[in-house]
Structure formats: C-alpha cells, structure tokens
C-alpha cells in the first residue's frame, strides 16, 4: 500500500484495511474464487509437520482477505482501492505452551517450516510459563462450510455503480442545503479455511459492508459549522442492504426515520443536510437530570463500551491493561450475583444473528458459534471466553469468541455481538415518548469517553431533541449524558418491543498488542433511562 493510500485510510480510522502483505489488485480479481483444494493441502501439510515435531495440538488458518473501499467528496472520487492479502497462520501447543508463526509462502514446504517455527516458539515460551495451557474440549466439525447469507455479493457490483451511489448521496445532501458532503463505501470478504488436529476442516466465506457519510453545514457569517453523520449501520450482509427497502424503515416521533436491515442512504443524506443546518441555530442544552429516550443508533456504542468490553474475560483478568484498560466487572461479582441493571435488562452475546457483523458459523478455534446470556434479569451471569480461558470460569466449553484479523495475526478473545434484548411487553417509541414529562430523545453516535475500568463514561449524540409533556419538541446542541455503568443500566424503566429492535455496530474495533481490529454488532430497541445527568459540553470553567 502506498503512502497516500495509507494516510487516507488512517484518517478514516480504517486501519483494518491495511493488512500485512496486502497487494493492490484489479476489481476483477476480487471475484476469483477461493481455492479450497489448495487450502486443504496446505493445512494438512502444516498439521503433519506440527505433529512430527511434537505438537500436542495444532490449528491452521489459511486466509484470503479481500478489501475494497471507495472514497468520494461532493462530486469527486478521491480514491478506489482493491486489496488482497493471502497467507497461513499456524498455532501449536508444545510442552504445554502456545507458539505461533505465519507465512505467505503458499507451498507445503513453506507451511511446514512455519509449523516447525511455531513449535520452537512454543518450547521457548514453555521455559518461562508458570502454568500449562488448558484447552476446553471441542466437538470436531469434520469437513464443513459456512457462508454469510447474502443476496448480492458487493464484490460483484461494478465500481461504477458504487461510485454513482456515493456521488448521488453527496448530491442529495448538497441539494438539500449542505456545504460539504463526503461518503465512503467499505466492502470486506474474508475467505478463511481452518483445520485442526481435533479433526476439523472448516471453509468459511464472510462478508461485511458499510456506507458511512458526513455532511457539513456552515454559517458563513460566523464561520460556525455543524455536521451530521449517516445513520446506516455496518452489517454482515451483501449489497442488498443498500436497496432502501421501504418496509425496513421506522417512522419515529419528531419526523425522524431509522433503518432496519435495508438502508436508503440518499434519503438519509437529505435529512442529514437539513438537520446539520438546523443544528447551527439550535439552542445549547440546559444541564441537569433528564429521562432519556435513546435510539439504537446511539445506544449501540454505550452497549459496546460499558457492557461488551468489560465482560471480555481477558480484560477482566488484566491481560488488556496496557491497551484500553481492565474491567470493574471482576469474576467475584458474577459469583456474588452482582446487579448490573434493572430487572428489565437482559444482555445476550451472540455469534449467529443474520445480518450482524459478528455472525460466523465457527470461530477461529473451530468452535461452533452460539448465543448465551451475559446479564439475565439485571444480574451478571457470564463473560466471553475462548478454549484456553473456559476452565477459569469453570466452564466445560468455549463461547466461540476467538478471532484473528489476518492470517499473520494470532487469534485471541474478541467480543461477540452483544445486544440488549427487546422488551417483552408491547411498546412502541411513540408511546414511550408520550410517557416522558421532561426528557431528551437521542439519535446517532457522538463523541464519548470512558475510564480504564469501563465504569465512568459520557456519551454524546448526532441529534438530541427535547421531550416536553410527552412530545418531541426542539433540537438542542452540546449535550452528553454521564454514566456510571451499574447506575445507568439500573435506571432502565422501559424497553420497546421486538418490532423496534435494530442493529448498530463497530466496523473497526481495536484490541490487543500488536493491535488487531474486528467488526461487531450491538442491537437494542429504543430504551428509556430515568434521571440521568446531562452535561453541556460547550461550557467552560472560565
């Protein structure tokens, strides 16, 4: 990847597109199918070499990672990049310790050498280890395959069609009053072949898609400007997500529109331009206590930061302390029946939900994915773990949470989809709002900060509206809600029903050293929180 491309990707926060040994290719090469027969030969060669060298366990990941991104601004195409990265990662246990090595030499000798290198690393690690690796058992999968259920492969869509869509989005925003408009499209295809000495040969074809945009309105007299980002979620779907199906739209109080499993980016861009312009003259929020009605387009990030991350077992145990901190949610709290939220609060971990970013058939340890409870009726009941962590919790199986972002990266525990279950009683957003006397209605991801134990945080929003006497009234600016994680989730007094359930997500979630990125969804229905402190972010002490 050249310097210009690197800088553009970094500025977009899309470092996850910059995989090792990425080569730039023509768009047509994105359509070359995976060579499953070759992958099987390479995997078997690595397994045989590891066994011959004394490994008690070995797994092999043959990965082909395809990335395409298109970047536009107003009527210009700024960049189109197609990238491919192919290689093999070999992980072993020898003398009770882990070892890992990787290669992009796609020959039997090349992968056998990587296996032997992994053995040497494991034996070196064993000399310093104070305990042996304990792997939870896994049911061998045999020879299986899994595909993201897509209707239209984004890689098959001509670049010209993608460019036309993005330029239409920009034009729609500009025609509706925006001064600037920038849109991007990210399409990712992970072709992953996993084999292990347990007896699994798993071929997976995984697709993800995201169309983010930002529109800007400027007050030329004062120089003041305001932005509004797109409200479309990143998804584990094909290009069909961008068809704008009217049946997937949610018409909400205040004339707002939200999107389910289909996204009309042009329509959203028109609304964004008008709302960015309205934000220029919106009054600043009055700080104080409010009842909050939070849309899934905002709440997903709060779930991600205050529930998903603190319940990663490696973070709980302190293994992530150098990078984004630890967790207040220590294992003794689970054992004591710690109250995480009100009895309405149920958090579900899931690696199977169709359309979600985290959906796969098997994780990167060959564990079949599933759904399980993290918080049940407000009580902390479980965490997220991998095969070598399960025994710490007294569990007999992994949760299927292992992931590596590239063939050259070692797999480790990553967050599954974590969602707040919808309410069990019929309730729509209009009725929820009607019951609020003094509140705020919050949409879209804003700026945020959270402490090193995932306990104290604050979150802003793209759009914040006042609620007075059961009605959505005016748009306000400069608001952010403050939380202490348990207090915040214990303030939940109502959750809309399943008909309002929607996914948000993080397309580039960072973790680990060296850093890796993963993609993860978080779903919820619109949720009410009572008596939450809201600050004015524009105020200064002076």
Residue ranges and their predicted role:
Residues 2-542:
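N-terminal small-residue-enriched
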């Amino acid at each position: 990847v050249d310097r210009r491309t690197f800088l553009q990707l970094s500025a977009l926060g899309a470092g996850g597109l910059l995989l090792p040994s990425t080569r730039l290719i023509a768009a047509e090469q994105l359509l070359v199918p995976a060579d499953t027969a070759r992958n099987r030969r390479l995997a078997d060669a690595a397994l045989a070499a590891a066994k011959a060298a004394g490994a008690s366990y070995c797994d092999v990941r043959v990965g082909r990672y395809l990335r395409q991104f298109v970047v536009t601004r107003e009527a210009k195409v700024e960049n189109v990049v197609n990238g491919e990265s192919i290689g093999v990662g070999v992980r072993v246990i020898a003398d009770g310790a882990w070892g890992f090595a990787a290669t992009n030499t796609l020959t039997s000798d090349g992968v056998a050498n990587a296996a032997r290198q992994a053995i040497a690393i494991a034996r070196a690690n064993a000399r310093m280890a104070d305990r042996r690796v304990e792997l939870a058992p896994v049911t061998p999968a045999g020879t299986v395959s899994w595909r993201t259920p897509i209707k239209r492969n984004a890689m098959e869509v001509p670049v010209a069609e993608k460019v036309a869509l993005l330029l239409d989005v920009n034009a729609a925003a500009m025609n509706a009053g925006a001064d600037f408009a920038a849109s991007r499209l990210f399409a990712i295809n992970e072709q992953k072949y996993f084999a292990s000495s347990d007896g699994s040969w798993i071929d997976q074809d995984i697709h993800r898609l995201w169309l983010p945009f930002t529109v800007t309105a400027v007050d030329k007299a004062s120089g003041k400007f305001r932005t509004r980002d797109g409200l479309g979620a990143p998804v584990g779907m094909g290009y069909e997500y961008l068809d704008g199906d009217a049946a997937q739209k949610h018409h909400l109080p205040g004339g707002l529109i939200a999107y389910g499993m289909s996204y009309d980016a042009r329509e959203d861009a028109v609304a964004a331009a008008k709302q960015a312009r309205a934000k220029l003259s919106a009054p600043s929020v009055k700080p104080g206590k409010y009842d909050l009605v939070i849309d899934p387009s905002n709440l997903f990030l709060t779930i991600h930061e205050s529930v998903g991350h603190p319940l990663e077992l490696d973070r709980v145990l302190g293994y992530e302390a150098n990078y984004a901190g630890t967790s207040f949610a220590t294992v003794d709290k689970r054992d004591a029946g710690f109250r995480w939220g009100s009895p309405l609060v149920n958090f579900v971990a899931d690696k199977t939900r169709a359309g979600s970013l985290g959906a796969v058939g098997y994780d990167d340890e060959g564990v079949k994915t599933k759904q399980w409870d993290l918080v049940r009726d407000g009580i902390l009941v479980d965490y997220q773990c991998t095969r070598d962590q399960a025994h710490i919790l007294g569990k007999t199986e992994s949760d299927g949470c292992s992931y590596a972002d590239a063939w050259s990266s070692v797999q480790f525990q990553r967050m599954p989809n974590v969602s707040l279950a919808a309410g069990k009683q019929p309730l729509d957003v209009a009725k929820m709002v009607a019951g609020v006397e003094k509140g705020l209605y919050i949409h879209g991801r804003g700026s945020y900060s959270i402490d090193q134990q995932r306990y104290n945080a604050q979150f802003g929003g793209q759009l914040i509206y006042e609620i007075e006497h059961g009605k959505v009234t005016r748009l306000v600016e400069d608001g952010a809600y403050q939380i202490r994680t348990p207090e915040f989730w214990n303030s939940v007094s109502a959750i809309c029903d399943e008909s309002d359930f929607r996914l948000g997500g993080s397309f580039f979630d960072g973790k680990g050293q060296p850093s890796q990125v993963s993609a993860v969804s978080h779903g919820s229905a619109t949720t009410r929180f009572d008596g939450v402190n809201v600050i004015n972010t524009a105020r200064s002490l002076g």
